[in-house]
Amino acid sequence: MSYFIICTVAFAVSGLTLFSGFGLGTLLMPAFALFFPIEVAVAATAIVHLTNNIFKVALVGKNANFSVVFKFAFPAAVMAMVGALLLNFFTTVQPLVQYVSAGRTCTITPEKLFIATLIVVFAVMELSPRFENLSFDAKFIPLGGALSGFFGGLSGLQGALRTAFLSRAGLEKEAFIGTMVVSAVVVDVSRLLIYGITFFSRDFEVLKSQGGVGLVIAGTLCAFCGAFIGSRLVKKITMRTIQIVVGIMLLLVGLSVGSGLI
């Protein structure tokens, strides 16, 4: 079941992220969180996210506007490291509440509450028409990079903010997509450096012992397939129905994470 869930999410969402407001991590991180601790889920998602985005760079990276990439990705990289360090700090904090539900021990930690809040906020953004065309003036691109990078490093959730701030950069569709992909690679490399230095080396045994390495590889391959098919077959997709489904799923996952069920 774990392979089915991870592979299905990675394949479906990877193709759609070329054209949609949400990113691969928005759904893949909660999917990994069903089977692993939050910090391991975030790091595992980052590996799939990075390798998938490198593949996307090969497909569409030549269209990127590197002037915009520099303005957005430099502050994003710095703040991604800050967010990743904060995530590491959260892993050292003692649980707030522990309880038993249906014979299973559920734990509520500050880390889970914070990430659950972010997931619910992104769910509301997906569900509300008010945020459907959310965008910011081009002068705020560095600020957008900083915010997107910070939340990417902390939770893996960054796609919606990246889209909102880059959509007003005056780029054609091809340049817009290429710029987003290259910027995402910069953020992924930055946060993975911190994950590797801090908790991921410590928690890798958790991933390995529970079959997570195979899940990461399978998720990566399925994400490659989804990105390839998406880049070849999809020209323009109306995302509203998909956004509603995504929003509902995120809302349920956010509530489950916040309550300690996940």
What are the residue ranges of the model-derived segments?
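Cytoplasmic-side transmembrane-helix entry/capping segments in multi-pass membrane proteins
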Residues: F66-A77, F136-G145, G178-V181, I242-G247
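Structural signature of hydrophobic alpha-helical transmembrane segments
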Residues: S2-Y3, F32-L50, C106-T117, A146-G156, ...
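Small-residue-rich segments of transmembrane alpha-helices in multi-pass membrane proteins
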Residues: F35-I38, A73-A84, I141-L154, V187-V189, ...
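Residues within membrane-spanning alpha-helices of integral membrane proteins
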Residues: Y3, A46, A116-I119, A123, ...
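Transmembrane helix exit motif
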Residues: N53-L59, A84-L96, K112-D137, F228, ...
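Membrane-interface alpha-helices at helix entry/exit sites of multi-pass transporters
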Residues: I38-A44, S67-K71, G170-S183
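Selective hydrophobic functional segments
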Residues: A43-A102, V189-I237
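Selected transmembrane alpha-helices and immediately adjacent juxtamembrane segments
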Residues: M1-F36, E126-M180, I217
